[in-house]
Amino acid sequence: MSKARVYADVNVLRPKEYWDYEALTVQWGEQDDYEVVRKVGRGKYSEVFEGINVNNNEKCIIKILKPVKKKKIKREIKILQNLCGGPNIV
């Protein structure tokens, strides 16, 4: 197995919970609480929409995941959890 030249040890100082997406337990919310307004982008594993929470009229971003392996979805969710609150993250 080859070793990455860049950021090979990036997770060494992080706790296992930060990078272990296979152990992630996903808590799915209620889909009926949200309404899609318009499409804002797409990626390899999902399409991204501007949305609204119908319970409180708050704007939100809705990421609709494409049908891919559960492992890839868990990895995507873990990355988004780690990015939450960062710069330019909605």
UniProtKB/Swiss-Prot annotation:
Binding sites annotated in the UniProt record for ATP: V40, G41, R42, G43, K44, Y45, S46, E47, V48, K63
SUPFAM superfamilies the record matches: Protein kinase-like (PK-like)
UniProt-recorded name of the protein: Inactive casein kinase II subunit alpha-2
Lineage top rank: taxon: Eukaryota
Family label: Belongs to the protein kinase superfamily. Ser/Thr protein kinase family. CK2 subfamily.
Pfam families referenced in this protein's UniProt entry, alphabetically: Pkinase
PROSITE patterns referenced in this protein's UniProt entry, alphabetically: PROTEIN_KINASE_ATP, PROTEIN_KINASE_DOM
Gene3D superfamilies (alphabetical): Phosphorylase Kinase, domain 1
GO biological process annotation, one example: photoperiodism
Transmembrane region(s): none
Entry function: The Nipponbare allele of HD6 contains a premature stop codon, resulting in a truncated non-functional product.
PANTHER family named in the record: CASEIN KINASE II SUBUNIT ALPHA, CASEIN KINASE II SUBUNIT ALPHA-1
Organism: Oryza sativa subsp. japonica
Keyword line: ATP-binding, Nucleotide-binding
